[in-house]
């Protein structure tokens, strides 16, 4: 709905995620509890 959210890492940190960073075909969405692979990058705030 908002176009962004947070991904929880295995060590408990929350990482900001914007929908434009989701690399998939079709509708870019993630479900709560879904396992994902990701790289953390520094960005503008």
Swiss-Prot record:
SUPFAM superfamilies in the cross-refs: Nucleic acid-binding proteins
Keywords attached to this entry: Activator, Cytoplasm, DNA-binding, Stress response, Transcription, Transcription regulation
Alphabetized InterPro entries for the sequence: Cold_shock_CspA, Cold_shock_domain, CSD, CSD_CS, CSP_DNA-bd, NA-bd_OB-fold
Keyword Phosphoprotein: no
Positions of the CSD domain: 1-45
GO CC annotations, alphabetized: cytoplasm
Subcellular localization, as worded in the UniProt entry: Cytoplasm
Induction of its expression: In response to low temperature.
Pfam families in UniProt: CSD
GO molecular function, one term: DNA binding
Main localization (coarse): cytoplasm
Record bears the keyword Cytoplasm: yes
Subunit structure: Homodimer.
Annotated protein name in UniProt: Major cold shock protein
Organism expressing this protein natively: Streptococcus pyogenes
Gene name as annotated: cspA
């Amino acid at each position: 709905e908002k176009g962004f959210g947070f991904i929880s890492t295995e060590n408990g940190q929350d990482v900001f995620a914007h929908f434009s960073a989701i690399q998939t075909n079709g509708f870019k969405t993630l479900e709560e509890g879904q396992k994902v692979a990701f790289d953390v990058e520094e960005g503008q705030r």
